[in-house]
């Protein structure tokens, strides 16, 4: 019996506060979760979202970076009654992606689709090998590699009706690089694999392809390919064969080039495909396996609206913890269009630099654009400054009221005393005596006159004075003063400062009563219980951990 499901976009999936919910409409617009190591993002928001999507009856694809994620999702399916929907894609299962694309598309259109898938394999292999995209000249190598693969797949499909990774490698490595000049070289062409494929395509094809594609294929291999400088041709060959050779042996050959037991459309009927080929167990092959399955699932979901109604109604999800391992250039396009296919994407990572480190710092704008496609962001505790600055800038700026105040108190006291005194005494004693005699003559013309005088005197004077004074004084004074000012100022500032994300959120565990908190941002949201002091589209959510 098929698992029941909800399809109404306004259906409630997850309670975020007493009055706020995550709806299916918001889920199909994408949810991105970011939080540092030990922040509780997996056991908090990650667990809550997984449970909500399983209870809603969705089908989905779960990408796994760590081996414990496989067991975690097995537990999720059991807890929410979806154990019968669970399919483990391990080394015993398979999806022959080339045969799948030809069955899904058919003809020349399938050749192009297979080529696109092969290019994603090359991109995933480069990422796994630590070779970042976005460097100078990458566009040239990408175009030339795609051209080689396109005309290889077309030739093999037309000539034999079947395409394998091994035949692709054999074809491109046996193709002559120059026209024969000796009889021995001409004779060798009769046994050459690549030449035989081109001849069969023209004379006795197993599948018909458009005549223009057939002529383009022959022209490429006989003219353009030979015209490449030897070094350029060798670099293109090395790029293609080094990645596809992985599919000639081991797990990748068994899971993706042999029998098919799993196809993406199974999720549209409610299956939960868990990629039990974790990256940290299978290393580069694990990363390629997860990315390859993700890509063909995305392509199938995008085209699901052309299928029968029973494959169009059920919502599906793509869930990736440690999403930095699985992101590629196609995600931006998928996130732009998947809403119409009822696809809910949940990507979780630690920080922005984890994306940059996997994709290359040259891809910073591409990463920012990719994140902008998610309508809901959940931010857990994070010590990374760039991630926190991104969160703060995403929430934005607004008028902030800041209180200012001043209070002063003072007191003073003064005491003083002064004393003064003076004594003075004055005594004056004096005696004086004068005595004198004299004569004076006055002579006149023709007459003389003579006279004499004398005087004598004795005197004594005495005086005495005595003064005395005293003065006393005392003064005392004091005072107190007090003033208080209070006011507010308005400033344009960040609604949530970046350091808040590294200090204010709970990380679960017994110290936090097993509660994990996170700031939930929704573009255009109007929460009924928004985060105080911020904006209506921000909510402080609390998630309970399972004890």
State where each predicted segment sits.
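Long, cytosolic, alpha-helical-rich C-terminal regions that act as interaction/scaffolding modules
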Residues: 487-490, 517-521
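Positively charged, hydrophobic/aromatic-enriched amphipathic segments
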Residues: 427-437, 491, 496-506
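Short gly/pro/ser/thr-enriched loop/turn and capping motifs at secondary-structure boundaries
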Residues: 68-70, 93-94, 352-356, 386-387, ...
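Conserved P-loop NTPase motor cores
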Residues: 31-39, 46-49, 232-241, 246, ...
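Positively charged interface segments
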Residues: 492, 531-533
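Beta-rich nucleic-acid/ligand-interaction surfaces
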Residues: 70-71, 317-319, 414, 471, ...
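Short coil/turn linker and secondary-structure boundary residues
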Residues: 106-109, 163, 362, 382-386, ...
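P-loop NTPase motor domains
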Residues: 2-343, 500-514, 520-531, 542-547
